[in-house]
């Protein structure tokens, strides 16, 4: 799949995960960006601590790479409790979930990533666990089967998803706290890049941090990945110090431009501009023109371009915006103006 090969893919790459854990902030005081989320969570956590209660169940949603897992771990650290981590696809049977729930200590956190991918049978078991701290388990099979209730300690479920709209209403309604993570501002990303450089022992100046941040598509995971690649460049082509000039040279070499676009982003936009006169163009024709699958365009390439105002989806098809023309140094056609 194209997403796995892109330097600017927001999804986690397996070999990155251990390093990412090392540079993640551990407490809210180290957590930069998402100001409203941070302020609200500070209040909710402090209130729960003062009452000696488990924090309400938390749903965190937003695009990949914005720190949902990081925030879940911070919540557990701030509450002074353990966290058990799993994901929706892993919980295939009700017994898988029951094994996790029955091993929780009071006020512990159970973090379920990709919670929108829970199977219906597992989700049914989760409802009474979230609402009443009870677990209904079927023992035996056939006519001899019977249900038993197990009492659970008060716990906090934190669910993370990139697709909040895919959650069922009964599940969504059981979360007392719902937080949406937004793309990060360049200033906040630059701070994150600087902190990561400190943790990794890198020499990085403020201008270098900003150069990396502005090409990171508003996503901390991408920013940290770009930092590691720029570090390689600085060590081999320079004295190891990362300045804005070194960062720009490295990222240009890696084909990540000053808007955070790679070859595929540019290919998509230029196809609309050059082959379809700026659009509108249907996604099937666009897929044929650039040699990609329709699903790749819709799920991988388009979201960031639309969010940043370079592309519009209309009932008649895709349109390149004036901002897209400006990015390529082209004149916007009159009908677009």
UniProtKB/Swiss-Prot annotation:
Disulfide pairs? none
Instruction: Give the EC number(s) listed in the UniProt record.
Output: 3.6.4.-
Entry keyword DNA-binding: yes
Entry keywords, A to Z? ATP-binding, Cytoplasm, DNA damage, DNA recombination, DNA repair, DNA-binding, Hydrolase, Nucleotide-binding
Q: What is its main location?
A: cytoplasm
Q: Which BP terms in the Gene Ontology apply to this protein?
A: DNA recombination; DNA repair
Protein localization: Cytoplasm
Outline the segment boundaries, as ranges, of region: Large ATPase domain (RuvB-L): 4-184
Where is ATP bound in this sequence?
23-24, 65, 68-70, 131-133, 174, 184, 221
Signal sequence residues: none
- Region named Head domain (RuvB-H): 258-337
Identify the stretch(es) annotated as Small ATPAse domain (RuvB-S).
185-255
* Superkingdom of origin: Bacteria
Entry keyword DNA-binding: yes
Cellular-component GO terms for this entry: cytoplasm; Holliday junction resolvase complex
Where DNA binds, per the record, is at 313, 318
Q: Which transformation does this protein catalyse, written as a reaction?
A: ATP + H2O = ADP + phosphate + H(+)
User: In which family does this protein belong, per the annotation?
Assistant: Belongs to the RuvB family.
Domain characteristics, as noted in the entry? Has 3 domains, the large (RuvB-L) and small ATPase (RuvB-S) domains and the C-terminal head (RuvB-H) domain. The head domain binds DNA, while the ATPase domains jointly bind ATP, ADP or are empty depending on the state of the subunit in the translocation cycle. During a single DNA translocation step the structure of each domain remains the same, but their relative positions change.
> What name does UniProt use for this protein?
Holliday junction branch migration complex subunit RuvB
User: Which species does the entry assign this protein to?
Assistant: Tolumonas auensis (strain DSM 9187 / NBRC 110442 / TA 4)
Source taxonomy lineage? Bacteria, Pseudomonadati, Pseudomonadota, Gammaproteobacteria, Aeromonadales
- Per UniProt, what is the name of the gene that codes for the protein in this document? ruvB
């Amino acid at each position: 799949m194209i997403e796995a090969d892109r330097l600017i893919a927001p999804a986690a790459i397996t070999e990155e995960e251990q390093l990412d854990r090392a540079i993640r902030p551990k407490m809210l005081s180290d957590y930069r960006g998402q100001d409203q989320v941070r302020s609200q969570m500070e209040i909710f956590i402090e209130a729960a601590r003062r009452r000696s209660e488990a924090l309400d169940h938390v749903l965190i949603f937003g695009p990949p790479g914005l720190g949902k897992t990081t925030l879940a771990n911070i919540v557990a650290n701030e509450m002074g409790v353990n966290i058990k981590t799993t994901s929706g696809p892993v919980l295939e049977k009700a017994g898988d979930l029951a094994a996790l729930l029955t091993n929780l200590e009071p006020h512990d956190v159970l973090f379920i990533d990709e919670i929108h991918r829970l199977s219906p049978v597992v989700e049914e078991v989760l409802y009474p666990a979230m609402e009443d701290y009870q677990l209904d388990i079927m023992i035996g099979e056939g006519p001899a089967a019977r249900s038993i209730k197990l009492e659970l300690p008060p716990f906090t479920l934190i669910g993370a998803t990139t697709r909040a709209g895919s959650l069922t209403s009964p599940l969504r309604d059981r979360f007392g706290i719902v937080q949406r993570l937004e793309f990060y501002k360049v200033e906040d990303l630059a701070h994150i890049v600087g902190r990561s450089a400190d943790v990794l022992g890198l020499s990085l100046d403020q201008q270098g941090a900003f150069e990396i941040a502005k090409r990171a598509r508003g996503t901390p995971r991408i920013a940290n990945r770009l930092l590691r690649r720029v570090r390689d460049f600085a060590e081999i082509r320079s004295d190891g110090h990362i300045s804005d000039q070194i960062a720009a040279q490295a990222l240009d070499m890696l084909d990540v431009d000053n808007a955070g676009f790679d070859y595929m982003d540019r290919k998509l936009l230029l196809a609309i501009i050059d082959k379809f006169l700026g659009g509108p163009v249907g996604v099937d024709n666009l897929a044929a023109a650039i040699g990609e699958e329709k699903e790749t365009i819709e799920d991988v390439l388009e979201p960031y371009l639309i969010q940043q105002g370079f592309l519009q989806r209309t009932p008649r098809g895709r349109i390149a915006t004036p901002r897209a023309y400006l990015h390529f140094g082209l004149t916007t056609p009159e009908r677009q103006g």
